[in-house]
A protein has these predicted regions:
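Residues forming the flavin
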Residues: 1-365
Length: 365
């Protein structure tokens, strides 16, 4: 099977890219390991920020449904769910595994929107049942309707940690505290205000010291941190919890990009190793594009815009649309992307993308 574009990852970036490419005449295949398209959106019950034409005030699960319905209704898109991309080969093919077996699929271009994985912390007892990543807790509650426990310690005060803490309380689960290693809260003030109104304490310059329990989590010890993020002896506090939820960040998933020979670089502001790519989301390997968290950890709103830019660029590269039209539409999308990244909490992300931009310019001489 050969397609003009193969999209790996059926989350917000991948689906947006697939739609934009297909709407401009490209034959697309979308591959996702999950049975349901939507990626992280399927478990995001909170409302998005931004402006109305970019889903402001719409819940993530509804955005995911809209994208999924649009993709399934597009005749130029073939969807492979429950299918995992196992490897990239030099003949521009992917080895994929589906319920029907293992096969190869070939593409003229590729969009890798493979997302990210949660970062874990090292501490005594971190392998006990009851220690979860925040994404796993969201999946349990918002997809399967299962409460993870009765009492939670949240580690990390970024948007995910704050939002999941609020959702836990809505589900009737006690959140004993949110601990944050940094001297300030990492997420939006609106989310922090919501959890504080529920009486959940947010302790900055604190972290978990250890988890307690023999067969599962039965408690945790937290302590204060000094300016070098070292625990301060004598500041320990024991907390009665049966769940420890780690919302300590994400790191991009780039396995297939490494296999494809894409040039990668370490950018801490973007979460780790990311591909080097230009303003069209194309990597230094011609015909290989990237979008979403695989290109750098960011919000779903910006991931969708980056996916659209990539899909539009694929259509232009394959000669489906004239260059002048591509540049006009790309510039509009780029302006919207810049506006979404203009807030103070996006300063770290902007620094990361400036690093990527400088690398690209330097290599082009």
């Amino acid at each position: 099977m050969e397609y003009e574009l193969i999209v790996v990852g059926g989350g917000p970036a991948g689906l947006s890219g697939a739609l934009k490419a297909a709407q401009n005449g490209v034959r697309v295949a979308v591959i996702d390991r999950q049975e349901e398209l939507g990626g992280q959106l399927v478990k995001q019950t909170h409302k998005f920020f931004g402006w109305s034409r970019r889903n402001a005030g719409v819940r993530g699960i509804e955005i995911g449904r809209r994208l999924r319905d649009a993709v399934l209704a597009e005749p130029r898109i073939t969807v492979f769910t429950g299918t995992e991309a196992l490897g990239y080969y030099p003949d521009n093919s992917l080895l994929i595994e589906s319920p029907s077996g293992v096969s190869r699929i070939t593409g003229k271009t590729f969009l890798f929107a493979t997302g990210a994985q949660e970062r874990m912390l090292l501490f005594p007892g971190n392998d006990l049942p009851g220690v979860y990543g925040a994404g796993a807790v969201q999946t349990l509650m918002n997809v399967y309707g299962v409460r993870p426990g009765r009492s939670v310690l949240m580690v990390g005060s970024g948007n995910i940690g704050l939002i999941v803490s609020y959702q836990l309380r809505q589900a009737g689960v006690m959140v004993r505290a949110i601990v944050e290693a940094l001297p300030q809260i990492g997420g939006y003030a609106v989310h922090a205000s919501k959890v504080r109104r529920l009486g959940i304490p947010i302790l900055t310059r604190h972290s978990i010291k250890e988890a307690h329990g023999r067969e599962y989590v039965e408690g945790a010890t937290i302590w204060e941190l000094d300016d070098k993020f070292r625990g301060i002896p004598g500041t320990e506090k024991d907390i009665d919890v049966d769940v420890i939820c780690l919302a300590t960040g994400l790191t991009p998933l780039g396995d297939l990009l490494w296999q494809a020979g894409v040039s990668m670089t370490y950018v801490p502001e973007l979460g780790g190793f990311v591909p080097i790519y230009d303003g069209n989301m194309e990597t230094e390997r011609s015909g290989i594009f990237v979008a979403g968290d695989a290109a750098g950890i960011e919000e779903a709103s910006t991931a969708m815009l980056c996916g659209e830019i990539a899909g539009l660029a694929v259509a232009a590269k394959l000669g489906k649309i004239p260059r002048h039209r591509f540049e006009e539409e790309r510039n509009v999308l780029a302006q919207e992307l810049s506006a979404l990244r203009s807030g103070p909490l996006s300063s770290k992300v902007r620094t990361g993308y400036e690093r990527i931009k400088a690398l690209v310019q330097g290599r082009r001489g």
